[in-house]
């Protein structure tokens, strides 16, 4: 039996900020090859400590700058003929055997932000400049919070479908067996519409007594989101997730978890274990599902419907 037409929908890559690597993976003078958005990139840290990202291939004869290239000052040097490209502008700054540099000797530079332990780049299908900023997480690096735990995994599905899961409270009960799903209030949107914020509440019983727990989830485009939980007075937990398209239907998800030090750090360990199990549960669905362009929603799918409308702004 032939599949319906909307079962073959291939979503493009949405515009936004995406992490290309962890900051700790990029030491001074280090060069990395990265493949994301269906493109080959070179990521490197200049001698002054700046993270830079350029298209991977030299404008001369097409050598891959990330395979044997090296950092020279604020430039990256091609391994083939030693052409040097400025990390910020992508313009060829030096050809060692030629005094006059051709005007077309350049490679595309990517907008970079290094924050929260990640190196982010701005992706836009039409190469337009960024229209919002990467948030700064005050908890990361705060002496009152634990050293962040890190976790990453590749997922064979489009980035939109991963993010959509967060707006689907029913699946938490069916797929993950969670009986204490939070009561979700309305989803709020920033003035420009780029940030969505969900607030939920439930009650948890602990050895220290019963506590009303509040969850706040903020999504900054499709590429990143934060989850903050507040329950025990004076204590908190932060989960930051970054989802980056490698190809349209292959995504790498990275998570960072930190808790206040007045909580036993086992809380962070338990949260990470639950997160890993949750992803494994979802993977059984994700590996075999199709993307419905026009899904049939029922009355209780309110947040899913709102999400589908919200994400439209991130596509050209």
Where are these regions (language model features)?
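A general structural signal for short secondary-structure junctions and capping/turn motifs
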Residues: 9-10, 33, 111-113, 243-244, ...
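Sequence-level motif detector for i,i+2 pairs with an aromatic at +2
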Residues: 15-17, 29, 116, 146-150, ...
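A short, structural micro-pattern
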Residues: 14, 106, 113-115, 237, ...
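Hydrophobic, proline/glycine-rich low-complexity stretches
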Residues: 1-16
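Charged, low-complexity, helix/coiled-coil-prone segments
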Residues: 1-2, 20-24, 100-116, 211-231, ...
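Rieske [2Fe-2S] iron-sulfur-binding domain
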Residues: 5, 19-140
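C-terminal catalytic domain of Rieske-type non-heme iron oxygenases
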Residues: 50, 127-316
């Amino acid at each position: 039996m032939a599949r319906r037409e909307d079962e073959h929908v291939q979503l493009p890559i949405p515009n936004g900020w995406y992490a290309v690597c962890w900051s700790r993976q990029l030491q001074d003078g280090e060069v990395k090859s990265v493949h994301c958005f269906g493109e080959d990139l070179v990521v490197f840290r200049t001698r002054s400590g700046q993270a830079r990202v350029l298209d991977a291939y030299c404008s001369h004869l097409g050598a891959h700058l990330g395979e044997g290239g090296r950092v020279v000052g604020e430039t990256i040097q091609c391994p083939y003929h030693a052409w040097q490209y400025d990390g910020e502008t992508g313009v060829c700054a030096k050809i060692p055997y030629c005094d006059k540099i051709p005007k077309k000797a350049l490679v595309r530079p990517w907008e970079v932000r290094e924050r929260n332990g990640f190196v982010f780049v701005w992706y836009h299908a039409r190469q337009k400049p960024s229209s919002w900023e990467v948030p700064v997480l005050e908890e990361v690096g705060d002496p009152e919070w634990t050293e962040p735990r890190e976790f990453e995994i590749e997922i064979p599905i489009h980035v939109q479908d991963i993010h959509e899961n967060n707006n689907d409270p029913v699946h938490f009960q069916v797929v993950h067996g969670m009986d204490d799903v939070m009561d979700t209030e309305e989803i709020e949107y920033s003035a420009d519409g780029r940030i969505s914020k969900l607030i939920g509440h439930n009650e948890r019983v602990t050895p220290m007594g019963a506590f009303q727990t509040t969850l706040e989830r903020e999504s900054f485009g499709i590429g990143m989101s934060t989850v903050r939980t507040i329950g025990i007075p004076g204590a908190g937990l932060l989960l930051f997730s970054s989802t980056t398209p490698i190809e349209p239907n292959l995504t790498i998800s990275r998570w960072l978890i930190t808790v206040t030090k007045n909580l036993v750090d086992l809380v962070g360990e338990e949260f990470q274990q639950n997160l890993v199990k949750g992803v494994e549960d979802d993977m059984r669905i994700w590996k075999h599902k199709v993307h419905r362009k026009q899904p049939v929603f029922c009355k209780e799918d309110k947040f899913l419907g709102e999400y589908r409308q919200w994400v439209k702004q991130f596509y050209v």
